[in-house]
Amino acid sequence: MLPGVKVTPEIAGIRGVEAGVDCRSPAGHTAFSDVDGLIDLVERIASATGLPVGIKSAVGESGFWDDLSLRMARTGTGPDFVVVDGGEGGTGAAPLAFADHVALPFRWGFARVYRAFREQDLTEDVAFVGSGKLGLPENALAALAMGCDSVNVGRTAMFAIGCIQAQKCHTDRCPTGVATQSARLQRGLDPTLKSVRCARYMASLRFELLRLSRACGVEHPALVTLDQIELLQDRWESIPLRQVVGYEDGWGQVSSGDRGELVDMMAADSDPAPEATD
């Protein structure tokens, strides 16, 4: 449900609804129904805006991604970046059954997508973004090792500015003022204070990522390989992440040219530690 206060005249005109009135937003749409339609839509938007155009998706069956990567390899068209959202990602609006049981967890879902593009030799032409509880340094590090060019941070950044997971996002009645258009409730969020806390969180995340990568013997988190990350199993066993996600040697790693640039960049970065919090 899109609250009426968010349905501006511009949005109303685009969606064909009445301005200022709550608008139901069904999961279905008519923009496209297959891979060819998706690619056509992406290309039309890119042509009209001159900007990179990407797609975001939670992951279930693999057929769509196999088909998409094959069409992109054949035609040289398609999205410029792909955002893969793990099923464990946070939301305040999804039905409980969807939040708990729909879509694969990030590591399994992203691996399916990356493998499809890697088999078509497209991973240097498409940027990959990970999402889904990646605001923790160990999770972000694994995502980068799996082939992500960057990671999205949502839940943990919201915690930093006061989110208490009241699950009221879709009602416009967030009690802490984080996710609301209500002027009264917005007073619960002090930008002067919360902006500093969010900045400190981001600086700390970066600092911890760098510490983990240096513990692995490399200069930058993107240089950590899947063989350097193991997952603990029952009965005191562990398994390399590469084996879990089914990657071949070299998959997920940056190119030799990018590796050199990262090393040079980090050599020039003094990497100061984040300031201590109050």
Question: Model regions: which residues?
Answer:
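Proteins with a high burden of low-complexity, intrinsically disordered sequence enriched in S/T/G/P/A and R
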Residues: M1-L2, V21-P26, S270-D278
